[in-house]
């Protein structure tokens, strides 16, 4: 029986988020090899990969406030663009360039490991409305999965009907794609071994989060270390809780991608880190 899994490796896992534009190439290679190994031994696994922008996209996005957007003028207005608007769109293009640059490193690692993967940039296929996906032509993703190709998406700039432009994280994209494709599992690999009740002390691991228990943990769940314009850990958990309430059969894991073999272990069904489920 075929199983569809979404796997994200966070920007903090594949870049040094404290050093702008610094890819962690050895780690990318290791992750790619783990994915290749798993696909060879699990012929029924269908995989969609997403990755964060790390120290590539987040630096420029923070400088230019790209996620907040710049409201579109009426098409009936004839006016010169002011300096603020010019600067916004300059930043929009810069974030696109940096996010795409990181994606090339990821794709190189996957292809070096003989993973049949293709990049499907959200900037060329997604339209947002007020920071959420409103239009996405997902047929290439579906056809890729049918051909046993691994579609790769990533945190990217997109045009927005209200804001003009914005940034969508991989989790933002998964929010839409999970409703369209109904994966059995979503795996979020990062630096943290789990979600912590007392971040940044990291002494109280949360084994499981459900909609009923989230409130008791939410105060201690922290943001990400380093630049992150898309919300950090608490935002990720909240988004995944929304998805498990939409699809009660969905299971989400948040775990460390730095430990040897963890990608293989989770892809093949082992439970690591923190689990998010409906009950």
Tell me what each language-model feature is.
Residues 1-262:
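Nucleotide/pyrophosphate-binding catalytic subdomain
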């Amino acid at each position: 029986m075929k199983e569809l899994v979404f796997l994200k490796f966070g920007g903090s896992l594949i870049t040094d988020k404290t050093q702008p534009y610094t890819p962690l190439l050895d780690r990318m290679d290791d992750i790619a090899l783990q994915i290749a190994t798993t696909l060879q031994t699990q012929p029924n696994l269908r995989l969609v990969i997403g990755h964060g922008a790390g120290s590539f996209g987040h630096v420029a996005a923070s400088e230019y406030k790209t996620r907040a957007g710049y409201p579109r003028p009426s098409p009936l207005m004839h006016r010169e663009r002011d300096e603020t608007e010019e600067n916004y769109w300059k930043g929009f293009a810069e974030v696109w360039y940096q996010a795409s640059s990181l994606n090339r490193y990821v794709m190189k690692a996957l292809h070096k490991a003989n993973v049949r993967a293709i990049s499907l940039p959200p900037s060329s296929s997604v339209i947002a409305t007020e920071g959420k996906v409103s239009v996405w032509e997902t047929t290439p993703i579906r056809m890729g999965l049918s051909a046993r190709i691994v579609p790769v998406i990533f945190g990217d700039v997109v045009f927005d009907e209200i804001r003009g432009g914005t940034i969508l994280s991989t989790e933002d994209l998964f929010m839409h794609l999970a409703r369209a494709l109904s994966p059995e599992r979503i795996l979020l690999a990062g630096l943290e071994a789990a979600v912590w009740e007392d971040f940044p002390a990291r002494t109280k691991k949360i084994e499981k989060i459900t909609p009923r228990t989230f409130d008791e943990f939410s105060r201690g769940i922290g943001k990400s270390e380093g630049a992150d314009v898309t919300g950090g850990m608490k935002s990720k958990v909240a988004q995944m809780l929304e998805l498990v309430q939409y699809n009660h059969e969905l299971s989400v894991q948040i775990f460390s991608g730095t430990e040897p073999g963890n990608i293989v272990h989770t892809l093949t069904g082992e439970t690591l880190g923190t689990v998010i489920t409906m009950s």
